[in-house]
């Protein structure tokens, strides 16, 4: 199992905090968001990573190589980070997966290591972690059928039909 971490974005909504620091290197209780993400994967036995960078990529590369020198981490640059989104970054990561299973993660989310464990032990081929709570307009909502097959994932889908919010951690089986 591999992990693909998307860390190319500018995070303009967090300015001035992200003026000189990538969002994933912002600290929460003394630990960066990226550090928390990597540690959650490592604690679940995943040590093969691809990080798609873009905005202030050298800061991300320097941080990761200094703090995780023994991990197998590759970097791909999304040179078009200012005009593209996560889908393009995922497209750039396609060759890394090489037909193997992988978990996709945004670099700027807070989540428990238990979510990774649940993704790894789930017997379904492709799974998506979600949060069940009262939904608003901004959440990325999930609509599924009665067998839990995902029918739609979107910010603009019906709140009434949605079963939860995507937390940004899908596992893909190749």
Locate the predicted segments by residue.
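Conserved N-terminal catalytic core of the sugar/cofactor nucleotidyltransferase
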Residues: 2-5, 31-101
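Cofactor-binding loop segments of dinucleotide-utilizing enzymes, especially the Rossmann-like FAD-
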Residues: 8, 53-54, 107, 131
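Short beta-strand-to-loop acidic/aromatic patch adjacent to the donor-nucleotide binding site
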Residues: 99-110
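Short catalytic helix/loop segments, enriched in acidic residues and glycine
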Residues: 20-35
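Conserved beta-strand segments of alpha/beta enzyme cores
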Residues: 24, 72-74, 149
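Phosphate- and divalent-cation-binding pockets in alpha/beta enzyme and binding domains
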Residues: 13, 59-62, 114
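N-terminal nucleotide-binding beta1-loop-alpha1 segment
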Residues: 1-19
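Conserved core of the sugar-phosphate nucleotidyltransferase
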Residues: 112-174
């Amino acid at each position: 199992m591999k992990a693909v971490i998307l860390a190319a974005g500018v995070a303009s909504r967090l300015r001035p905090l992200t003026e000189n620091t990538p969002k994933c290197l912002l600290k929460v209780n003394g630990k960066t968001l990226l550090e928390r993400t990597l540690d959650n994967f490592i604690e679940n036995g995943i040590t093969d990573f691809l990080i798609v960078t873009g905005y202030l990529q050298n800061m991300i590369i320097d941080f990761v190589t200094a703090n995780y020198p023994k991990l197998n981490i590759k970097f791909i640059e999304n040179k078009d980070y200012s005009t593209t989104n996560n889908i393009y970054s995922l497209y750039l990561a396609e060759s890394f997966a090489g037909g193997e299973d992988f978990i996709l993660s945004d670099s700027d989310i807070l989540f428990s290591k238990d979510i990774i464990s649940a993704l790894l032990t789930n017997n379904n081929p492709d799974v998506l972690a979600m949060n069940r709570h009262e939904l608003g307009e901004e959440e990325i909502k999930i609509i599924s059928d009665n067998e839990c097959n995902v029918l739609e994932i979107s910010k603009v889908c019906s709140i009434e039909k949605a079963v939860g919010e995507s937390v940004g951690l899908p596992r893909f089986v190749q």
